[in-house]
Amino acid sequence: MRLFSVVLAVFTLLLPSQAFAQRIKDVASIQGVRSNQLVGYGLVVGLPGTGEQSPFTEQSFRTMLRNFGISLDANTKPKIRNVAAVAVHADLPAFAKPGQTIDITVSSVGEAASLQGGTLLQTFLRGVDGKVYAVAQGSLVVSGFGAQGGDGSRIVVNTPTVGRIPNGAMVEQSVPTGFANGDTLTLNLHYPDFSTAKSLADTINERLGAQPENGYVIAKPIDAASVRVSAPRDVGQRVGFLATLENFEFTPADAPARVVINSRTGTIVIGSDVRLLPAAITHGGLTVTISENQQVTQPNAFADGQTAITTQSIVDVDLADSRMFKFEPGVTLDQLVRAVNEVGAAPGDLMAILEALRHAGALRGELVII
């Protein structure tokens, strides 16, 4: 409980009250210059009996042998406990060239117990267009492990059915980009905001000597997310132009007043501009505890009876004392958090209070629950 109070207070106090200068490269990206997702299906071999015997794994195994010129009789059922069917995925960076290597992630798609010690055989990685952009192969690095006893007991640490192969795929072809096309480039903000888009365009025009008053502009905001920038046609000059442009510093607009709640972990992040309207709050907690004890009833030694097991249930209800808080106009959520923490409230209590304040219209800010 005390840890929650300290961590939440730190989150609240460290949030800046004013925006600060940032580089363009840290707040925006170039439209069309991005990574691409690749995916493939393959087989991992060499497992120490931790593979699987599923139908699709057997079918894949037969297909692999057929490609190597080996045919199995249809009635022959191979024992392949050292083989596992896997899905392979990777991100192909922008401008990746043939011959370069990328990291890949390998995940079991069947009932394999572990991929520890396995080797991925040649697997084609395809893009959304169905074309092969990389080929993967290599020995897996698996951080997790598992063990199983003869009675069915089992222990698993981390995730032994997922592994990685650093530099495990070789790029076969590049993905075309529109970087060198046209007379303009478009910068897309990571967090769309009209004020930030205008400030970004004004900074570029000022630093590059544009004269908006005479109708000569280099950067022009398109909407809340994008700024169009005139750029040289020559590829070499365009690279140098962007190298200079992306290091310009400007001051983005203040972030919107927002409260973000992760209901699964109890994490609460509060923006510094969030305010409360006058409100009175009361919140009480009802705790119900149910415990069960097994009791054995034993008959007398010479009595004609049987031993019986009965269950005794104990239900305990604890209604915590509730307190009312009254806040004046303009109170920050930091003050609300401190008031709630003083009575030892749990993260769930604060979540309920914040949601109730939003429904009452007293929370001046966006409430986001993830």
From Swiss-Prot:
One of its GO terms (biological process) is bacterial-type flagellum-dependent cell motility. The keyword Signal applies. GO terms for cellular component: bacterial-type flagellum basal body, distal rod, P ring; outer membrane-bounded periplasmic space. Disulfide bonds: none annotated. Its main location: periplasm. The keyword Amino-acid biosynthesis does not apply. One of its GO terms (molecular function) is structural molecule activity. It holds the Pfam family FlgI. It is found in: Periplasm; Bacterial flagellum basal body. Residues 1-21 form the signal peptide. InterPro entries: Flag_FlgI (IPR001782). Keywords: Bacterial flagellum, Periplasm, Signal. HAMAP family: FlgI. Belongs to the FlgI family. Assembles around the rod to form the L-ring and probably protects the motor/basal body from shearing forces during rotation. The basal body constitutes a major portion of the flagellar organelle and consists of four rings (L,P,S, and M) mounted on a central rod. This is Flagellar P-ring protein. It comes from Alteromonas mediterranea (strain DSM 17117 / CIP 110805 / LMG 28347 / Deep ecotype). The gene is flgI.
